[in-house]
Amino acid sequence: MSLGGASERSVPATKIEITVSCRNLLDLDTFSKSDPMVVLHTQSRASQEWREFGRTEVIDNTLNPDFVRKFVLDYFFEEKQNLRFDVYNVDSKANISKPKDFLGQAFLALGEVIGGQGSRVERPLTGVPGKKCGTILLTAEELSNCRDIATMQLCANKLDKKDFFGKSDPFLVFYRSNEDGTFTICHKTEVVKNTLNPVWQPFSIPVRALCNGDYDRTVKIDVYDWDRDGSHDFIGEFTTSYRELSKAQNQFTVYEVLNPRKKCKKKKYTNSGTVTLLSFSVDSEFTFVDYIKGGTQLNFTVAIDFTASNGNPLQPTSLHYMSPYQLSAYAMALKAVGEIIQDYDSDKLFPAYGFGAKLPPEGRISHQFPLNNNDEDPNCAGIEGVLESYFQSLRTVQLYGPTYFAPVINQVARAAAKISDGSQYYVLLIITDGVISDMTQTKEAIVSASSLPMSIIIVGVGPAMFEAMEELDGDDVRVSSRGRYAERDIVQFVPFRDYVDRSGNQVLSMARLAKDVLAEIPEQLLSYMRTRDIQPRPPPPANPNPTSAPEQP
């Protein structure tokens, strides 16, 4: 049963405030200096169109403005959030859209700002031919209320009896209201069996999930009677807000549970029971952004399936086929995930391996060979470097088999085991087309790796059934090996075919894939830091006089 028609809308990971400064701008005014203003545009994921998001104030007569007006953006780690900053010289008598008023622009992703040292970046302004346009400085700051966690406990009294042979089995469903009037489910309590006066266990929920930072936004709570067949009976509902809930820190709050249908039919209807908020508290916790800002680096490693079941790379039917017109599923998966993670890795050097191939010249089978053919240094420069090495390997190795995951998982785990101070977190992307041949060893490797600062993403390509991969995912049943359970859930598996855009839009396909496979990484990183009691380091001090953009590796 669909509870309340809740829409499936993402809750922003957090809200980020961007502060903008510029240095050494072009001077377009004859008798004074420029009067600059910055316009921020964001790019639509679906249409790729740029839309104006907001503007800073105009600062008169300066080439080095520090703008007071900030941009507040919803931040999703798992999405490539492209930004465009246009700088204009504003003459009150002219329109800023005229080319003569344009001072330059910079393109970058929100993740690049957050992933910069201390969540600060400096970029050159470009766009005016033959001119040095100066630089733009961007600083990201997480809004403080985004780190709040609310903990509450509720009970009910004299709920309507819904079961013929016994009392009700009640549970609560919480919904956050959206700006368009719809509601999004954000929490469900446990079911308390056979009672009209249930007391639910205390639970915690991020405040942003409850109200998205708007303390007066409506929170709707439905009361249901649980049924085994899923057709849960609606008992009633009530509404509140975060601000109202927070008053329970000093007093009990009692809500009437109302059933609109009963209220219309029965004149003497009063309510379907009451729900009492017994306790409510708010605590702050460290966030993903805190760790990134404090210098934690995401180390990205790639492992690609070179087994024969992928088909001859020279044939169009192969999953590795290098078409001049479009990327293969392997290349799309690599690009989709890598282009987001690379923003959080300062050196942009990524180890990349293949498995399941025969290597020249002697035909040795390898389950962990460097794509760049350099055993001493498997690092590739940027995601484009990984793709280049992948394409080169397809021309030189022979696809063979079988499909072994354990060697490359253990390889990354050995590197992760050397880091225990929270300064680095490892993300391994495995792209494969089929059935795993070393399930026992892979489970053992995952269980061992679950105590280390690492996560594993597995993307299945092609038409195969991936039941074994679902088993490794561990969302429903924690992965175990020899009676030992994984300390944390560190594996995320998705079949790529579920994300392919039917119209053939590869950009949209990659965005959908990245959104799903990367969504769990921030929480997995936080779970590791919490279990090890590792606090984020303070961000490095800002450079008081930045003048030029840092060189790219």
From Swiss-Prot:
GO cellular component entries: plasma membrane
Domain VWFA: 299-500
Annotated SUPFAM superfamilies: C2 domain (Calcium/lipid-binding domain, CaLB), vWA-like
SMART domains: C2, VWA
Gene3D superfamilies with a match to the protein in the record: C2 domain
Domain of life: Eukaryota
Cofactor(s) the record lists: Ca(2+)
GO molecular function, one term: metal ion binding
A Pfam cross-reference name: C2
CDD domains: C2A_Copine, C2B_Copine, vWA_copine_like
Record has Disulfide bond as a keyword: no
Family: Belongs to the copine family.
Full protein name: Copine-9
Species the sequence originates in: Rattus norvegicus (Rat)
Gene: Cpne9
